[in-house]
């Protein structure tokens, strides 16, 4: 289908054929074309025209129209043809109107972008011809569909916008428009639009635009601007339209007025003599005034061609307002003066000033406007002439407003200087007290010499009237009165009160005033972080000469109460003082004053003395002072005393102190006393100090190099040799330079690790702060700290140097944040007391305390004793804490130091505990320290307890649970205890005897039995339970049935019943094997009197008959499988009435390793008591290990397999003391020399240490368990010299023959001789371990007491009356740690070589043939 589109071109009609109807895709493709020429442009235009009949109107289509037209208009020929066709088109359909609108909008956009609108004159004239009154009426009447009417209205508005552009262009370029008839429609539109304003609310904005556009067109074309304005202006404010549209009309009037001479003057008169501005909102009114100001100033800048004599208009307005009697007169005056106050005229200032002066006195509220007028126009005539027409009260108000504006706004400084000088002179001339309140409002005070004299006289007046306290801010702004002291000739009175206040004696009156100015002004300024005035005064030779010692005293008085509220400010101040002191020409009095100031400041600001640069500058100063030939010795000595006090105070940072002493300070300051330490030579100390300072200053960057991070070019040099030597140089560091002063909240800075004004040691030292580091890889803060800690642990054994980092770099908030975070990370990963001390020390140095410090302190509390802890660290921790923790760390120091203590540690008050600790903490404290006060607190809180020990119900141990089950009546707590047992299956093998005892209590039997069956699901636990149940069936061997016989038998049957078949078979084979072995002992009883060889033959014969099944294991070592009974290994053991024997077994561990294990089998003995004793000894051993105590115990294994039978582990590589004696060795000393070599050999000394360690362990065991029957037959010595006790048949309240003849500890003469006598080194080791072990056991007594208590109802013979109570008494809780130490030493002394020990040994010799 062929389609033809006709285009009425500029000269002829053009027919464009199209092959198809236009689609939206066609339009989209056209919009993407970059450039059009005449041919492609007309074809594209034809497609656009065709789209008006093929497509539906949409905003997207309209946008593409505009885009296409903008590109077409780039080609002049194409644009002419299109404008010709468009000019003849009548807007009928929706898309036709839309196409025309898009073209007009494209034209407007190009004009707005700078294109000359005259290029489109013909098209604009065509638009004017279409602007008929019918079009406007048709739109207003809204007779057609909404879409077409909206589009037509857009057509009208766009057309008027383009026509206005053309009229404004023609007026500007040609002055007058010739084709006036073309634009005649504007007058009709102007009146119709005016009539329609307010009637069409929905179209108000658009009709207001039509009105403004037609007004502009008509006024500019007809050249009747003034007439149109005078016609419209009076009635605009009465129109029922919005303020916005009213404002738009006023603005349009103003802009039109600029096209006609004198028109703007008429508008100005109308605006400011009518309620025009009042009718507008304040915002629109101010904006309108700004437009008028811009027009007046613009015309003024061009010589006033348009406005003419605007000043005459201002006068007319002034007279009109002055004569006005309307009620809104004040508002009109304010509007007019506000307008004048913002104009920069540059001429007629006197006339404008007269207008203001005639109004402001009557209307004081306009003072602010007058002030603005003065400032922006730089009025420079004497303002105090205002006083002639006003009162002092008015002047006070005027200057207050004026100075307030100067403070808030930027104005010409030279002009403001004049204003301030004029005021000060006015104040001095009048000396009126009403004006004193204005002095603090002065924005600043010029430092001109003539002003300084005026200031002197003003202060003289203020001091005389004693009103100096009322001018606070004036003091801050007063410049130093330098250079005028000798030329002050004013006759002033002697102000006694001022002289007394400043402690001035024999000072002439004029200098009293001068020094008063110095004191009051500089004190105020210094408090507000400004020391510049002080620096000027102390260098003012004229002032020093005239005031003599007065200035020295006043400066000292200023600094007497100095408080450092900003480290940066104080550091800058100190550096500035040292800079002056280091000037070669600085006079002696100035040096005296500087020394006084430095002493005062450095007493208060500790951070500065830890800065290397300060020490370097002091050394430079001492060199300079020594070169001053006429300087008095007293001045030099005062500086030396000052520096000595500084060096004494930096000793708390040992690395930094060493560095200062070795690398910076003059050696004469130390009088031959140098830093001490573990160093081989002075050179060793020197190199170590440099290395430490390299770490201190390079932290943290130097530890990140291993991770591939090079935070700065100096990082690798941080600890290198040449670099370290360079550190000693005298180059000034950046840290010593004066900095901008700023006060900070230290806690907030450190908490966030940020500080905009942070000072880093980025200097010749090569140390780099985090602020200066290169960007870090994108990792978390925690990961970065982990890497840092890893780097430190690889290189450093200790981080004590972090204290030096805190002292020397505390101004670098990011570094301090890193130190704190690092320490907390280390404490969480691996708790060390040293790290805790450094963290707390850092908090105290920085005067902060973060919440997590309590977390780490509580960790230390619950950690218990650790004897590997450095005692010095414990003491230091006590110094960094208070309240309970001071007591705790002091007690820890006493325990681990092994030093005599004369200090009585007092437990803290109740309030400190209640406020700081929760119940769980108090439970731990009570169980550790056994304090009556804590006990009462816990009793009031109803915390569960037994025998004054309390339970933490949220963290129950196994022995806690067992005790609660037996002793407490709280059902919920008992249930929780059983639940805890079921959760602790891995620990149950150890507690099997206690689990069995639990069955004796009827109130909990069912739950106990249920729990046992649950635990018996573990195969080996089940085996141990059955054997132990069998061991408890009878009272004594098999003589009498136990009261619980039936109960225990039932339990055995139930456990066996619930065993899987395979597990039951394994147990039966194991039991058969064990029974066959223990049976041998009972079968040998008839042969008790046979020879040893005969007994041995019979035992081996029995053993050879025993069948060994696969999977048989050592009962107390389930992992050791027995693969063979060693042939001929058995032998009978010595016993008075029984025949125990020992046999060897070849066993295999899970790894396949084969070894020999020796066991003893007994029959006729109750082994349960030995089991209990060795359980407790095992707990002793665990406590010692956890406390890092080198105390040896060997809790060998014993297991009762039934009533009266048992198996005992043989202690390998050991002999009894009795056996040693029978080998013709007279004493232990002789044996040790024979066994381990010469007394001074390493092997011998090691054996002595081992012996002392084991002797301490078993002495404590013997003391606490009250073990008796200690003779040479049950004391073993192994091949490393360690003593091991066996056979615990007599303990607690049981002794042989009920005779208690043994000493508390077995310390024979031969033991003392072996240890070198009571003063020997070995004996000292023994005593030290005894004391430490005793204290360690006291701190962990709860579990031990509960373990002893667990067998109270077992009917064991050792449990006689008060057995548990006496066990508790042996901890001596009534003694402090200090007195407990004394008690242990007295116990040792009491047992040493006692007759009771010798007597018992003799008893054993007679009764059991045990000679030694």
Curated annotation (Swiss-Prot):
Region (Catalytic loop), start-end ranges: 1266-1274
Catalytic activity field: a 1,2-diacyl-sn-glycero-3-phospho-(1D-myo-inositol) + ATP = a 1,2-diacyl-sn-glycero-3-phospho-(1D-myo-inositol 4-phosphate) + ADP + H(+)
Keywords associated with the record: ATP-binding, Cytoplasm, Kinase, Nucleotide-binding, Transferase
One BP term from GO: phosphatidylinositol phosphate biosynthetic process
Single GO term (MF): ATP binding
CDD domains: PI4Kc_III_alpha
A single Gene Ontology CC term: cytoplasm
Domain PIK helical: 878-1055
Activation loop: annotated segments: 1285-1308
Intracellular or extracellular location(s): Cytoplasm
Pfam families documented for this protein: PI3_PI4_kinase, PI3Ka
PI3K/PI4K catalytic domain residues: 1127-1396
Region (Pleckstrin homology (PH) domain conferring phosphoinositide binding specificity): 1056-1163
InterPro entries according to UniProt: ARM-type_fold, Kinase-like_dom_sf, PI3/4_kinase_cat_dom, PI3/4_kinase_cat_sf, PI3/4_kinase_CS, PI3K_accessory_dom, PI3K_accessory_sf, PI_Kinase
Region of interest (G-loop), residue spans: 1133-1139
Catalytic activity, EC: 2.7.1.67
Family: Belongs to the PI3/PI4-kinase family. Type III PI4K subfamily.
Role: Acts on phosphatidylinositol (PI) in the first committed step in the production of the second messenger inositol 1,4,5,-trisphosphate.
Protein name (Swiss-Prot/TrEMBL): Probable phosphatidylinositol 4-kinase STT4 homolog
